[in-house]
Amino acid sequence: MSDSLLDLLQQTLEREMPICTPMGIKAKTWDGSRLTMQMPLEPNRNHQYSAFAGSLNALCTVVGWGTVFLLLQSQGLTGNIVIRRGRIRYFRPVRAPKFVAASLPVDEEELAYFYELQRSKGKTKIDVSVEIRDEQGPFVTFSGSYVVQD
């Protein structure tokens, strides 16, 4: 989709979540339902030379937040986005020099309800799933519940 939306997201993250800059988190793609973001290993590694679990959690949380941000922007909606709850599972160590986390598309009915509540009440919530994976399967799966309020 629009590079301008990705640019807006990146600028917003750098301004509102400054930890994203030293972590090297970068918005890569947005197709209207799925956001991908990339992060380098080196500033986010642990003593085992694999990605630090806290950095992986932060990346997945930001991808979920960014997905909600872009969904709202795509409909001309705004609001304060916060994570209410997150659940993460680690399956294998991440050792690639750069790796990508991707949100999974939200169910269409759930998305329609999300938009309807924000328009009518100025308050809504949505669950977003995120994965870091390769051709062999997932490294990390994350599910976050996000709340939006005017």
Residue ranges and their predicted role:
Residues 47-51, 92, 115:
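Short histidine-centered beta-strand/loop micro-motifs
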Residues 23, 33-35, 77-86, 98, ...:
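A generic structural signal for short beta-strands and their flanking turns/coil linkers
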Residues 95, 105-150:
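HotDog/MaoC-like acyl-thioester-processing domains
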Residues 19-51:
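Catalytic strand-loop segment that frames the active site of acyl-thioester-processing enzymes
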Residues 67-101, 105-107:
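Hydrophobic beta-strand-centered segment that forms part of the acyl-chain substrate-binding groove
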Residues 21-25, 84-90, 112-115:
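Short structured motifs
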Residues 1-17:
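Extreme N-terminal tail/first-helix region
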